[in-house]
Curated annotation (Swiss-Prot):
Disulfide bonds: none
Taxonomic lineage: Eukaryota, Metazoa, Chordata, Craniata, Vertebrata
Gene3D superfamilies: Rhodopsin 7-helix transmembrane proteins (1.20.1070.10)
Expression sites by tissue: Expressed in a subset of sensory neurons that includes nociceptors. Expressed in the subclass of non-peptidergic sensory neurons that are IB4(+) and VR1(-).
GO cellular component entries: plasma membrane
Keyword field contains Protein biosynthesis: no
Keyword Transferase: no
First-listed, main subcellular location of the protein, grouped into a coarse class: membrane
Membrane topology: Multi-pass membrane protein
The encoding gene: Mrgpra2b
One annotated GO molecular function: G protein-coupled receptor activity
Pfam families: 7tm_1
Protein name: Mas-related G-protein coupled receptor member A2B
Amino acid sequence: MDETLPGSINIRILIPKLMIIIFGLVGLMGNAIVFWLLGFHLRRNAFSVYILNLALADFLFLLSSIIASTLFLLKVSYLSIIFHLCFNTIMMVVYITGISMLSAISTECCLSVLCPTWYRCHRPVHTSTVMCAVIWVLSLLICILNSYFCAVLHTRYDNDNECLATNIFTASYMIFLLVVLCLSSLALLARLFCGAGQMKLTRFHVTILLTLLVFLLCGLPFVIYCILLFKIKDDFHVLDVNFYLALEVLTAINSCANPIIYFFVGSFRHQLKHQTLKMVLQSALQDTPETAENMVEMSSNKAEP
């Protein structure tokens, strides 16, 4: 027999929803700080553009998760079916965008390590900006088409073929992102830690590797669930509710963890009392091995207004 609180709220549902709200609030603050610093206070480079867009996607996803969990706990229904559909579509857009940004970051980092000369000399200047714009537009189109064929038209007449096609395309796109992310991550690890030509590890490499590790541990299970849901939607009703709630909590942790990773890596071996948040984030995105000259430069930046 399930334990309930007054108002018939199941404890097994209440605790995960509260965890989502708590992790969401922490993640909102962290991603907002990252977005604010990268957007207005730090000079942008190829990777910081991706990090900025990833922070925006995580911020919007956590905000949507908090709203959905709060409405569920308060037993407040959505204003209308259209609002519910738009809300779910936006949540899906920012979620897929976040995965796409991670894949793009991993690929760019892999290219910069495997082909450093080509990357420095021949990479188009505005590649990051163009890629981020393409990712946002593509994610938006995929989710709008999926919602249109599987929600709007499906309620009016039999539209199973079109819905199935969009589900297969969406699942295939997510599988493609996972394959790219995993292969580029393995190549990056091999280049950094294996073979005769090992490269010196930078703080940025540590930041990216930790971010990818957290995603594989906390974000990947929900991605696999989404892929299965898109491919066998009509027959995928056997998943335990508690397991699904655990996946939601892990996804919230994944979106919340990135800013914590940035500030942890940036402050490692540094005295926190002598550092600002701007300096910590700048240090986490440092793409050159630490030398005495780098430390002197960081100290001089501290003295700047």
